[in-house]
Swiss-Prot record:
Region feature VCP/p97-interacting motif (VIM), mapped onto this chain: 622-640
Ranges where the CUE domain occurs: 456-498
Zinc finger intervals, RING-type: 341-379
Protein name: E3 ubiquitin-protein ligase AMFR
Role summary: E3 ubiquitin-protein ligase that mediates the polyubiquitination of lysine and cysteine residues on target proteins, such as CD3D, CYP3A4, CFTR, INSIG1, SOAT2/ACAT2 and APOB for proteasomal degradation. Component of a VCP/p97-AMFR/gp78 complex that participates in the final step of endoplasmic reticulum-associated degradation (ERAD). The VCP/p97-AMFR/gp78 complex is involved in the sterol-accelerated ERAD degradation of HMGCR through binding to the HMGCR-INSIG1 complex at the ER membrane.
Pathway given in the UniProt record: Protein modification; protein ubiquitination
Subunit structure comment from the entry: Interacts with RNF5. Also forms an ERAD complex containing VCP/p97, NGLY1; PSMC1; SAKS1 and RAD23B required for coupling retrotranslocation, ubiquitination and deglycosylation. Interacts with DERL1. Interacts (through a region distinct from the RING finger) with UBE2G2/UBC7. Component of the VCP/p97-AMFR/gp78 complex that enhances VCP/p97 binding to polyubiquitinated proteins for their degradation by the endoplasmic reticulum-associated degradation (ERAD) pathway. Interacts (via the VIM) with VCP/p97.
Disruption phenotype: Mice with a conditional deletion in the liver display improved hyperlipidemia and insulin resistance: mice show elevated energy expenditure and are resistant to diet-induced obesity and glucose intolerance. Increased stability of Hmgcr, Insig1 and Insig2 and suppression of the SREBP pathway and novo lipid biosynthesis.
Amino acid sequence: MPLLFLERFPWPSLRTYTGLSGLALLGTIVSAYRALSQPEDGSGEPEPLTAPLQPEALAPARLTAGGPRARDVAQYLLSDSLFVWVLVNTACCVLMLVAKLIQCIVFGPLRVSERQHLKDKFWNFIFYKFIFIFGVLNVQTVEEVVMWCLWFAGLVFLHLMVQLCKDRFEYLSFSPTTPMSSHGRVLSLLIAMLLSCCGLAVVCCVTGYTHGMHTLAFMAAESLLVTVRTAHVILRYVIHLWDLNHEGTWEGKGTYVYYTDFVMELALLSLDLMHHIHMLLFGNIWLSMASLVIFMQLRYLFHEVQRRIRRHKNYLRVVGNMEARFAVATPEELAVNNDDCAICWDSMQAARKLPCGHLFHNSCLRSWLEQDTSCPTCRMSLNIADGSRAREDHQGENLDENLVPVAAAEGRPRLNQHNHFFHFDGSRIASWLPSFSVEVMHTTNILGITQASNSQLNAMAHQIQEMFPQVPYHLVLQDLQMTRSVEITTDNILEGRIQVPFPTQRSDSLRPALNSPVERPSPDLEEGEASVQTERVPLDLSPRLEETLDFSEVELEPIEVEDFEARGSRFSKSADERQRMLVQRKDDLLQQARKRFLNKSSEDDGASERLLPSEGTSSDPVTLRRRMLAAAAERRLQRQRTT
């Protein structure tokens, strides 16, 4: 809203403002009375506006025995350049008191939205009329400024009252328990406003006859604007009251409401557009700040007219398609369904049937199809869009492709385009401010994709594995290296693009000692062969023994997960990541050294066992199991000590 700082200014209350205005008026009257009561010396003459009053005209009034009359005092106040603004302020104060009285009688306490609308309307009106007076008309005398200020004071009073009536009508029309007395008070005020607009037309004719055709055109346009707004609200109120008193459901209400809004809004926009064009041509202000403001307002009005015409064309298209494609439901179908309209929840005496079999009111379905081309109940597509709508849908699909992954031919998700759309709506601040949009497109592909840090990939992989623990870590990480997005990888898992192995595959790979046969060396010392022949002996362990060996699975699992984690590049930009990689390499080297040591010690133990003379014990399966368990326990203790 323009002049936003005025809202934050600590304005006085209406009571304080009224008291100050009364004191100012009383002071000016007393001053004028004293000036007229003094003997004629020329020092007390007021500063004239245009043509100063002759002293001979005021002398008879001063010489009367009863002193100056009220007419003489008023004439003196109007002729003074300072006292006249006190009279203008008094007129504004009277209008505010009348508005407050109307609020108490007709509306009562105002809602928050009504107060905000009144503030917006008032400050916008003040801003534009200030530009009109000093930028378009370029008035030179105080008399003209006073005349236009009084004229616009009456106009802003009518505009605010009409706006308040419109907001209250919209509130009362949606309230099911509104008494008729409330409707009667608001409608009576609207009729009084319409009669006041007729009085403004008479003032336009009288003033325009004396000041020229341009002044008449400006004043007539302003009065017509407020008259059209008042008539619009009255017509809407009449339609609503007729619907309330009408028995049953009035199917034609939507059509009457739509065409009333269309005609009145188009007439209002056309009048306002012509009024601003007249201001631009009359003022000859091609290179000024006022011309910029008028150009912005003209652009806004022109786009509003275009938008309203496009909406009307869409309405006609929807009505034509609805009447051509969807037949009226028969009484038998209404009796069989015996249901209420799913949009307005009212009983249906007449309805239209969609291809999916659902029934709706004619007006309800028309209002729905203006926004969406699907069934309100089952969301089945009705396919009634024409070529332009189809193109808009196609553009919307293309926009969705930038946000949603689409499967490529090889089954991998296609990389998306990250579009950033910024929109500035100037009409929310002021109707004359422009609205603009900026769209920044970042097209990503495999070659030019920005390499995300490995720590981010690992964090995303852990996040996905918390949601899908059955998916191996390395598969999640491989997909993240391609997509760089948690959402896309999640969609790939849900849609089956990532082949998840069976749960038994991991357990089999982690526990090879439990399922694979044991190779037992059987050296032949008598023949002196250097080769070692192996003999496969199936290893059948008891349940307790399997529980004892479960620690190997628990310890191998994090090691296997760590092997699949993405290690950062040796030339990483992050110092923390380089330090983490160094520590990780050091731990890997220590683990490899421990493994080599344990393998070497186990080989030495096996060689010493082969050299034992006791042949019976070496071939005993029970002894072999005991030795294996002892070796496994020893390795476990060594690992615990080293870690």
